């Protein structure tokens, strides 16, 4: 058997469609402080935006296909979870979203409500800001 690829050094792109690139960009850029890392328009019928933080090991890509409806998140448990162990940093992140009119929603899994707040993006996908650390 071949040795598996060493994915621990890979850069992760989380990509999904959206029906409203402007609204989803505002949510992640203005609400969560992401930067626009790249954009494209009408590339083989697709337009998109990549959002993230320069130097980070991940970024998000949102695409819109001309003539196709992406629809809303398939469940209330489709999550991106950001662990923010520093209480002041967590409070700033929550306040930033709330200051833009985004209200927390009750998490589908009550675990996330114990130390975090859950927000829905414009497509119904959820983002958890968890006031805890993550240790593997």
Predicted regions and their residues:
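Vicinal oxygen chelate
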Residues: 1-7, 10-19, 37-39, 49-54, 70-136
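Short beta-strand/turn micro-motifs at beta-sheet edges
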Residues: 1-3, 66-70
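Short beta->alpha connector loops
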Residues: 42, 65-66, 87, 110-112
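Short, charged/polar, Gly/Pro-enriched secondary-structure boundary elements
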Residues: 55-60, 123-127
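Acetyl-CoA-dependent GNAT
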Residues: 63-68, 131-134
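Core segments of cupin and vicinal oxygen chelate
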Residues: 8, 16-58
